[in-house]
A protein has these predicted regions:
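Glycine-rich, acidic
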Residues: 1-91, 95
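Glycine-rich, small/acidic residue-mixed loop/short-helix segments
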Residues: 63-180
């Protein structure tokens, strides 16, 4: 799902269904497992931890499959498809969407990512404090190919903070959450 966790979608019979009764039943049944209700903010944190990109937030029509690390899903052996010529011409380029870890600050949207020498290299598209990882994390858009870069600075309202630039997802690459 949107959070990178294993889950379920429930469908109902409409008028013959009580969402409130189901909600109460699930909370009661989950007490032993310490199930609690949460909100969209917790889902947002999990989305970032899982490295799940959101169209319109983390990327838009300016990005191609190479920029997003999705080239393995392109069948270049196929005789033709819309955009094939442009993708072949561009060639395999490094990803422009990466992650950052910032132990001293919670990154927020539009915070500026800089190289260690202060050059602007990108910006935060989604950020949060990760209770699981005990650090600030963010998805960042890089202005150009910086796949080999591993350290940088984050300019926020509170100052400049050291960050580690990393691949996504931040953890659970095999999508095993919840762990049995």
């Amino acid at each position: 799902g949107w959070t990178g966790e294993k889950g379920f979608e429930l469908y109902s019979d409409g008028d013959n269904f009580s969402g409130e009764e189901l909600w109460n039943y699930l909370l009661e049944a989950g007490k032993e497992e310490k199930l609690i209700a949460s909100d969209i903010a917790s889902m947002h944190i999990r989305r970032i931890e899982a490295g799940i990109l959101d169209y319109g937030t983390d990327f838009d029509q300016r990005f191609d499959p190479f920029d997003l690390g999705l080239q393995k899903f392109i069948d270049f052996d196929k005789s033709d498809f819309i955009g094939k010529e442009a993708l072949v011409k561009k060639g395999n380029s490094p990803m422009r969407i990466r992650g950052i870890r910032c132990p001293s600050e919670k990154p927020v949207v539009d915070d500026e990512l800089q190289s260690v020498d202060g050059k602007v290299i990108g910006s935060v598209t989604a950020g949060a404090w990760s209770p699981f990882l005990e650090t600030g994390i963010a998805i960042v858009q890089l202005n150009y190919d910086l796949e080999s870069l591993s350290e940088g600075k984050l300019r926020t309202n509170s100052g400049i903070h050291d960050v580690k630039i990393c691949d996504l997802p931040f953890h659970d690459k095999e999508k095993n959450i919840p762990i049995d």
